[in-house]
Amino acid sequence: MVAPLVSESQSSSIEETDEQQQQYQQLARRRTIQSDLVDIEAESISSALPEGFNYEKKTTATRFLDKTQKYYPVILNIVHGAIWGVLVRKGLMSLTTYSGSFLSGVIWANFAACVVMGLAIDGEVFWIRLLEEKDYPNKGAIPVYTGLTTGFCGTVSSFSSVILEAFNKAADTDIGVRHHYPNGAYGIMQFLAVILAQFGLSIMGFHMGKQFSAVVDNYLPLVTKRIYKVLELTSMILGVVLVVITCILIGVKKQGSWRSWTFSMLFAPFGALLRYYLSKFLNNKVSNFPLGTFTANFLGTLLLAVFTLLARGKLPGGKGHIVTNTIALHVLEGLDDGFCGGLTTVSTFVVELFGLKTLFSYRYGTISILVCFAGVVLILGSYNWSVGLD
């Protein structure tokens, strides 16, 4: 018998099918590798964040502070980092906010915080001996590291300021500037412009910091346990000294616009500590959604809206403002920049976005931004449209 001949078209079809199967297999392998890398990244970031977060349902182990953990080193290092953090943020904002700029200087503060956070999260060499000696279960449990990430970076960046700026652009309520959009719908474009620019640059900053860490690690020394204890004690003492100096300055020097800086230094540690404990106790409650950071950002944004209303709100009938006392205004500014700035964070928010899988990352980011913005609209927007803001 003679075997049937295969036509050229059938042969070509078989080859195309084999090629497609190979492409599908390559795509499946690539996605599997990408998924594995995401899991490794999530596990690494979760252990590197002092607050931690539950990136998968299977990781249900809580990271609560227990009675045996040393509270004072963690608390005082966060206090120390938060005070320097609010000073850096206010300084950067003062230097980079100018007439004619579309965005306020908080964009550069958030960028700087995310670069440092990226360096800290990916940097391993400096802490490697402490981890090898099993003094700490992971990098996130080291008090000085907690002060650097949660205290300093978390306070240099401010989530609430970004949302407030997005509202001011969308509602055309910038202080002393009115843009007079052709119609209200252009406010949506302004909102998107602020959000995309602010968080886009912050995400880029974190990615840059992670890349820089590979270079910086080559030049960092290995810190021994003895040297680390000196660093930890020094940081704790400086934290106490800064608090004492701040209280003395507030009590002795009763005049000057710089009082808003001292009030910010006073309130910032309270905001940072509240954020830390909210994240510590709530981040593991919901899988793939850092509830603690979300709660801190939402609460801080609502409080910032209330404080802004008190500072800028007009009285009914337009006969004056709600708050006119100079010291009261300085206290409100201190609460804005200090407490709300310390309570809300972009740097930790961006780290969590990197640590979640793509779908959950977009869900977490979108819900956080929209819910916080809605809260500001309800508080500031309703008052602005019914009574008015200065």
From Swiss-Prot:
Family matches, as InterPro entries: FluC (IPR003691)
Region annotation Disordered: where it falls in the sequence: 1-22
One Pfam family in the UniProt entry: CRCB
Compartmental location: Cell membrane
Coiled-coil regions listed: none
Reactions catalysed, as given in the entry: fluoride(in) = fluoride(out)
Subcellular location, principal: membrane
Entry keyword Amino-acid biosynthesis: no
Topology in membrane: Multi-pass membrane protein
Disruption phenotype: Highly sensible to fluoride. Growth is inhibited at more than a 300-fold lower fluoride concentration than in the wild-type. Has increased intracellular fluoride concentrations.
Any one GO MF annotation of this record: fluoride transmembrane transporter activity
This protein's UniProt keywords: Cell membrane, Membrane, Transmembrane, Transmembrane helix
Keyword Cell membrane in annotation: yes
Extracellular compartment segments: 94-100, 165-185, 251-256, 312-338, 390
Residue ranges that the UniProt entry lists as topological domain Cytoplasmic: 1-72, 122-143, 207-229, 280-290, 360-368
GO biological process, one term: fluoride transmembrane transport
GO cellular component assignments: plasma membrane
Regions crossing the membrane: 73-93, 101-121, 144-164, 186-206, 230-250, 257-279, 291-311, 339-359, 369-389
Family: Belongs to the fluoride channel Fluc/FEX (TC 1.A.43) family.
Cited function: Fluoride channel required for the rapid expulsion of cytoplasmic fluoride.
The protein, known as: Fluoride export protein 1
Originating organism: Candida albicans (strain SC5314 / ATCC MYA-2876)
Higher taxonomy: Eukaryota, Fungi, Dikarya, Ascomycota, Saccharomycotina
The encoding gene: FEX1
